[in-house]
Amino acid sequence: FTYAKNLMYDEESALFYRDGKYIYPKHKTNQGLKDFWSRGNGWVFAGLAKVLQDLPENDVHRAEYITIYKAMAKSLAAAQQEEGYWTRSLLDPVQAPGRETSGTAFFTYGYLWGVNNGLLDKSIYEPVIKQGWKYLTEIALQPNGKIGYVQPIGERADQHKNVGPETTADFGVGAFLLAGSEMVKYLNN
């Protein structure tokens, strides 16, 4: 984690670049901005929640992970779109506009876990959770039971690649189920 963090974590934005090829200013969005991939940051945010869940309280890295997790929570909240989703390029919605479910589900899970476990302030993050969950259950979840608007596998967020209600993938479904499992705990608290 330390190697990846040192290479790809942007302290200013509190987000991770996709990989070493996407680090600013070498790589920029079409608008000249930093490019942070939604699903990739979703894996990190949800991954930190999963690690913190099992990491001993006295682990030497725990405070560092909590600091990054909380900084990401703040940054991601500011990037959430009005409809409740996050765009494929987090800080440049024009780069690849429109709905994206896999990152949104990972973020919603991460926020739910943080509130459920006392690491995130419910009064601050409940609106983010509610908007994310509303998007997941009212827009991403299709009448036939499929989870739509999942960005396909690919190297970058391509504004010319259509992501629609029929676009699905197993990792999007898995992220949706993670969010759902944590929502049950949230509702029971």
Labelled PLM ranges:
Residues 35-50, 105-107, 176:
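Alpha-helical bundle segments that constitute or directly flank the non-heme di-iron/ferroxidase center
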Residues 34-37, 59-66, 93-104:
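Short, surface-exposed loop/turn motifs that are enriched in glycine and acidic residues
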Residues 45-91:
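Oxyanion-binding "anion nests"
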Residues 24-29, 89, 158-160:
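Short glycine/proline-rich turn/loop motifs
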Residues 86, 93, 98-189:
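CBM-like carbohydrate-recognition segments
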Residues 1-20, 25, 66-84, 127-145:
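Long, well-ordered core segments of solenoidal/helical folds
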Residues 1-8, 46-48, 52-55, 80, ...:
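Sec/Tat-exported extracytoplasmic proteins
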Residues 20-39:
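Acidic/Ser/Thr-rich, low-complexity mid-to-C-terminal regulatory regions of eukaryotic proteins
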